[in-house]
Structures are given as structure tokens and as C-alpha cells.
């Protein structure tokens, strides 16, 4: 009986139907394994591709670790922007930028401006900045200079506008009138400092910005001091411009301001040498002679009473505050010291002044300065 059961089991186990079923099951399991492995492989490839794509999108646009800028002009197109990118050093990822630009529809959103390319900015982030017009501001320093033409020449390299456009705005009568100044007094609006502006700022907008800074600078306290000195803010700037040119010594400036205020109050001509240089347009003059003193100009304070029509340079805040905080004394004259230190000998009487002037003239002669 036992042998019969074993025989039946052996028959079932080794029957053709059973063998086929086992084979079919093995095939199915193998297919499943292959499908799983293929799926895992495809997923791995997708992960790698996604990683590469993310790297290309968010990796630094170029190899520059410091500041680097892309300047886009008003007439630039998407193609000219990409051409500018390709012309940059440090291996820019222009192809990736084109791809990102297509994703962001940059072609219809080209904005002029100055854009940061360096400091590790990613390509996708860069293209978002370009599309949104998110410029990097410019640090614009307003310097102490002699003329409006000098100012235009100094500011232009930092801006899209050229020096001619800036100078035109600085002398535009209608624009200046809207700001309460004219071509003679507009230098007072320029308060030397460093300001943040956009590279694309127009000359007109720049003047309005400078006017706002001027209004901020002239606090209630400064206005009160100007009034106490008997001057308007523009007159303070005009006198400060003379003080600026008379001495670079900050400690001496309040004394110089006090001397000129004394002369104004006594009805004396200022007789300031820097105004003669301005009238002649010769700022390199080292020795003022009698022939220079007769220059026919409203700025020549040897010929004209009172202050000049406007500032003879862009005065620094230090010179302006020297006028507002002028020194109270009885000096009416001053002359450069004979030691050429850049400081001055002050005098209350004309006789004292002549003695000081004689010593200085002798020192000039010894040095052969004419």
C-alpha cells in the first residue's frame, strides 16, 4: 500500500502537465525580475539625468568668484544678449542660459540693465534676473570737482548715459527751474557722497535723485545755522566752494569761512583768489598776478561785490559744515603761509596782511614760481 502511494506521487510530480506549470512559473518569475531590474535601471538613469539637469541649471553661470557684470543696452535683443554672454571670459554656460531662457520666455522680456554674473550665481537664477529686470545697483560717487562738465565726465563711466547727455541735463534750464535752481546754482545740488543708483538711470532722474539727497542733507539744524549766518543754503554752498578751494586743511576751514563772512558783513569785496581761477577757467594757476585780477566775469570777486552767482566748485560736506560752524574772530585778511604748508596767516589789519603777503611773495620768488 505504501509503495502504491509513492508511485502515485512520483507520477504526479513527473507528469508533463506539472513540469510545464513549473517551467511557466519560472519564466514568469524571471520576467518579473527583468522588469524590476529594467525599471530600477531606468529610474537610476532618470535620477542621473535629473541630477545633471539640476546641476546645469543651478551651477554657477561662470567661473568668476568675484564681481562680473553683463551690460544690456536698450537696443539689445535676446540674440545680442547671448552673444555678449559668449564673449565673456571664465567659461560661461551660454547653452544652458539659452535653454533656461526658452523655459522662461526670455525672448519677449529683454530688459536693459547691469546684471551680476559672478559670485557663483546660478544660470537659472541669472536668467530669472534678466527676465525680471532685477539689476545690480551701481555705487555712484559724487566727487568734488570744478565744473559741471567735470562732473559729467566723472559720473558717465558708471552709468549708461554718456557725459554729453549728463551735461545736457545739468544745464537744461527747464529741468533746473523745476528743481528751484539755475545753471549757476545747480552745483549746490551735488552733495559729495556715494549713492546707489541703477546703471540705466536717466540724467533727468539722476538730477531728481540728487535733489532728494540735497533735501535730506539740509536738515532743520543746518537750515537754522545758515539763517543765523545770514545765508540761504545755496549761498552757504557758494561760500563753501570758495573755502573748499582755499584750503584742504579741515581744521582751518571754519576760520577761513569766518573771515569771508566778516568781509561780507563789512561790505568789503571778498577778493578770493579761487574765484579768479574760476573766472579764467585756469585752475592750475599757482600765482595770481594783477593782470588776472581784472578778469571780466561775475565770478571775479576782486571786481564784484558779494558772493559769486553760484558755487565755483562742488563743495564737500566738510566745507559746507565749516561755513555753518564758522569761527568767530576779527580777521579780515589771509595769505598763504610762506612754508607752503597749505595753511594761512590771518590778519585783522591791512598792514599785518601786507607783511604776510610780502613774506609769501618772497618765498614764491625763491622757488621761481611765477
Regions found by a protein language model. Give the residues of each.
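Short, positively charged and aromatic/hydrophobic N-terminal segments
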Residues: 5, 10-19, 24
Amino acid at each position: 500500500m505504501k509503495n502504491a502511494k509513492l508511485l502515485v506521487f512520483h507520477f504526479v510530480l513527473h507528469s508533463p502537465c506539472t513540469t510545464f506549470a513549473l517551467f511557466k512559473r519560472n519564466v514568469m518569475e524571471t520576467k518579473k525580475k527583468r522588469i524590476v531590474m529594467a525599471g530600477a535601471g531606468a529610474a537610476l538613469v532618470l535620477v542621473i539625468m535629473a541630477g545633471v539637469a539640476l546641476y546645469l541649471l543651478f551651477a554657477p553661470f561662470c567661473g568668476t568668484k568675484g564681481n562680473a557684470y553683463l551690460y544690456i543696452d536698450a537696443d539689445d535683443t535676446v540674440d545680442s544678449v547671448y552673444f555678449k554672454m559668449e564673449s565673456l571670459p571664465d567659461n560661461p554656460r551660454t547653452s544652458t542660459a539659452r535653454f533656461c531662457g526658452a523655459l522662461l520666455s526670455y525672448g519677449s522680456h529683454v530688459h536693459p540693465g547691469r546684471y551680476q554674473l559672478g559670485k557663483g550665481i546660478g544660470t537659472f537664477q541669472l536668467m530669472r534676473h534678466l527676465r525680471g529686470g532685477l539689476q545690480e545697483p551701481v555705487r555712484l560717487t559724487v566727487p568734488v570737482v570744478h565744473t559741471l562738465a567735470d562732473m559729467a565726465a566723472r559720473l558717465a563711466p558708471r552709468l549708461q548715459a554718456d557725459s554729453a547727455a549728463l551735461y545736457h541735463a545739468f544745464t537744461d534750464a527747464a529741468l533746473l527751474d523745476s528743481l528751484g535752481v539755475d545753471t549757476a546754482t545747480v552745483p549746490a545740488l551735488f552733495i559729495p557722497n556715494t549713492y546707489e543708483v541703477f546703471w540705466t538711470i536717466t540724467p533727468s532722474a539722476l538730477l531728481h535723485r540728487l535733489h532728494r539727497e540735497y533735501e535730506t542733507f539740509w536738515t532743520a539744524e543746518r537750515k537754522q545755522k545758515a539763517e543765523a549766518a545770514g545765508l540761504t543754503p545755496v549761498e552757504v554752498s557758494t561760500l563753501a566752494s570758495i573755502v573748499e578751494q582755499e584750503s584742504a586743511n579741515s581744521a582751518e576751514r571754519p576760520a577761513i569761512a569766518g573771515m569771508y563772512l566778516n568781509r561780507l558783513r563789512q561790505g568789503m569785496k571778498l577778493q578770493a583768489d579761487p574765484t579768479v581761477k574760476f573766472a579764467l577757467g585756469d585752475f592750475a594757476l599757482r600765482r595770481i598776478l594783477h593782470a588776472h585780477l581784472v578778469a571780466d566775469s561775475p565770478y571775479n570777486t576782486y571786481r564784484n561785490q558779494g558772493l559769486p552767482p553760484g558755487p565755483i566748485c562742488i563743495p564737500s560736506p566738510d566745507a559746507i559744515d565749516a561755513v555753518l560752524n564758522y569761527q568767530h574772530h576779527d580777521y579780515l585778511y589771509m595769505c598763504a603761509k610762506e612754508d607752503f604748508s597749505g595753511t594761512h596767516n590771518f590778519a585783522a589789519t591791512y598792514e599785518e596782511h601786507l607783511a604776510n603777503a610780502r613774506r609769501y611773495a618772497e618765498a614764491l620768488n625763491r622757488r621761481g614760481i611765477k
